From Swiss-Prot:
Interacts with YRDC. InterPro entries: UBA. This is Regulatory solute carrier protein family 1 member 1. Residues 162-179, 188-203, 380-395, 404-420 have a biased composition (Basic and acidic residues). Residues 78-91, 313-331 have a biased composition (Low complexity). The keyword Ion transport does not apply. GO terms for cellular component: Golgi apparatus; nucleus; plasma membrane. It comes from Oryctolagus cuniculus. Residues 544-584 form the UBA domain. Residues 16-35, 150-161, 362-376, 451-465 have a biased composition (Polar residues).
Length: 590
């Protein structure tokens, strides 16, 4: 009982000084601090900052109380209480222990406050950048477990329990379990705060991930706020499962983002890509079908480029299209074919008039009417008759007298009209002989009237002149070959005409009149028929062409020989003859 006054004296001045009664009772102080820090309202996620402020105020108040408690043993030691020194040593020891406990509680409160501020800062970053928060989630949870005082300083809590047990046993037996209750209040409070914060963060991030990636909400399996009384192992396992689900969601989202080249916040783009892919495949499948269709306008050369241009533009819109190389080759081949055909026509038209006459005029075409020519069918000789005649007279050169009378009518105009009247009488070599077949020798007369227009500048004082030209054709015989009749080339057609022209020269007479007259006579006289198997002599086509047509061709810059040859080829059509002559000047590229 002697030890109670010093205890009362040491306690009552503390009450009189205005200090809280909790300064002498560390158990009640620990309960107040843990009660101020532990409860966290799950419904209001923004209430963490006021709780952190409350924890700071509680830690400051406890620090002040601990300092005053350190001064209490000094105030309690008086000269009258020297006998109570052994009993006062116990409060001094308890005060030092309470100071250590206060320091540990202050450090833990500061760490919890820093953790709460870190959660607030992290929550703001989550609101600003969802993707960054999701990437750093596992690291953040690992950091929380690393700096938490429960994991770092487990010895401090044990020291607190060991130091508080003697004092509680001394005062009363009822609060003997107070240190264990303090530890039970403190440790579940910290775990409750940690798990509630983790649950809220997991729920928020799980909902956002479900909205972004369309995955099931990982927060459904998390621990709700009302189940703080569950065992620690189950709580940690649930938190770890939530973290693993978040990590799996993040890894799948990052993999999908790197594969598709899109951000995590654009899931609609990832959905639209496979939606558009079938249509693109259909387009790619329809392009070769369009390319297989023949291009329109490939026949017409002016419209070819337009058709190819339209085809190229449509294929570029569709996407990957083949270049129009095949169509270009087809167009080139069609153009080349057309040019070859034109070249063949030009080659045929560029042949000399005599060669054209050889091809067209044969012995089989004697019955065809050429202008005003009339041929008697009885004048045809058979090949057997001619062979018989040649065998009877092998060494006799047969000469057929042919009288050609040429009458030239000169008008007053520069264009002179010359009318040639030729009376040719052909008589067979053996007129009075009879052959084995008994066919009589026939005589025929071919009357040809030809009208030829010659461009000249003769005056009106020139008179009509008549030229007599004797032509002696030769019959060429061959051994074992078919006999053929040819007309000998005229040696000098206008010898007499030139002699008369020099006696009476005209002042405006052109110097090329001789050539013009010679060219006019050559197409009808200078004809050599090739060997043929036909029967009978070759009848030359007449030159009964209008003077206007010949004049038109001559004015185009062509010679009379070319004009007559072209008219012979086309059958007297002046337009077609002029077109043939003009086509000769076209150069075909090779």
């Amino acid at each position: 009982m002697s030890s109670s006054p010093p205890l009362d004296g040491s306690d009552h001045p503390a009450h009189s000084s205005g200090q809280s009664p909790e300064a002498g009772n560390p158990t009640s102080l620990a309960r107040s601090v843990s009660a101020s820090v532990c409860p966290v309202k799950p419904d209001n996620p923004d209430s963490t900052e006021p709780e952190a402020v409350t924890a700071l105020e509680a830690s400051d108040g406890f620090q002040i109380n601990s300092k005053q408690t350190d001064r209490l043993p000094l105030q309690g030691h008086s000269p009258c209480a020297a006998a109570a020194a052994p009993s006062s040593a116990m409060p001094l020891r308890h005060s030092s222990e309470a100071a250590g406990v206060a320091d540990s509680l202050e450090a833990s409160a500061e760490r919890r406050t820093q953790g709460l501020r870190f959660h607030l800062h992290t929550r703001q970053e989550v609101n600003l950048s969802i993707t960054t928060t999701r990437m750093h989630e596992p690291q953040m949870f690992a950091g929380e477990e690393g700096w938490h005082p429960e994991n770092q300083n487990p010895s401090q809590v044990n020291d607190l329990q060991q130091h508080q047990e003697p004092e509680n046993a001394r005062h009363e037996a009822g609060p003997r379990d107070a240190p264990s209750d303090t530890g039970d209040l403190e440790l579940p409070g910290e775990r409750q705060q940690k798990h509630e914060v983790a649950d809220r963060e997991a729920t928020m991030r799980g909902g956002r991930l479900q909205q972004d990636a369309g995955l099931p909400d990982p927060g459904k399996g998390a621990l709700p706020s009302g189940h703080c009384g569950r065992p620690d192992s189950e709580t940690l396992m649930e938190v770890d499962a939530a973290e693993q689900s978040l990590v799996a969601v993040l890894s799948s989202s990052v993999g999908n983002g790197s594969a598709s080249g899109l951000t995590l916040g654009n899931p609609l783009m990832e959905v639209e890509l496979p939606t558009c892919s079938p249509s693109s495949e259909i387009l790619n499948g329809s392009i070769p079908i369009q390319d297989l269709q023949p291009p329109e306008g490939s026949v017409e050369m002016p419209g070819t480029d337009r058709a190819y241009g339209g085809r190229a533009s449509s294929s570029s819109v569709c996407g990957s299209s083949q270049p129009p190389a095949e169509s270009a080759e087809e167009s080139c081949s069609s153009i080349t074919t057309a040019l070859k055909e034109l070249h063949e026509l030009l080659v045929i038209s560029s042949k000399p008039a005599s060669e054209a006459a050889y091809e067209e005029v044969t012995c089989q075409s004697e019955g065809t009417a050429w202008g005003q020519t009339r041929v008697n069918p009885s004048e045809r000789w058979t090949e057997s008759e001619r062979r018989t005649q040649d065998e009877d007279r092998p060494q006799v050169s047969h000469a057929i007298p042919e009288c050609v009378k040429t009458e030239k009518l000169t008008d007053a105009s520069p264009d002179t009209r010359i009318e040639d009247g030729e009376n040719a009488t052909f008589q067979g070599p053996g007129g009075g002989l009879s052959t084995d077949h008994g066919a009589p020798r026939s005589r025929g007369s071919v009357h040809e009237s030809r009208s030829v227009t010659v461009t000249s500048a003769e005056t009106s004082n020139q008179s009509h002149r008549t030229l007599g030209v004797e032509i002696s054709p030769r019959l060429l015989t061959g051994e074992g070959d078919a006999l053929s009749q040819t007309c000998e080339q005229t040696k000098s057609l206008l010898v007499k005409d030139l002699g008369q022209g020099t006696q009476n020269p005209a002042p405006d007479r052109p110097a090329t009149r001789e050539d013009v007259c010679r060219d006019a006579a050559r197409p009808s006289l200078e004809v050599e028929a090739p060997p043929s198997h036909s029967s009978g002599p070759c009848i030359l086509p007449p030159l009964g062409f209008p003077a206007a047509d010949i004049d038109r061709i001559l004015r185009a810059g062509f010679t009379l020989q070319e004009a007559l040859g072209a008219l012979h080829r086309v059958g007297g059509n002046a337009d077609l003859a002029l077109l043939v002559l003009l086509a000769k000047n076209i150069v075909v590229p090779t």
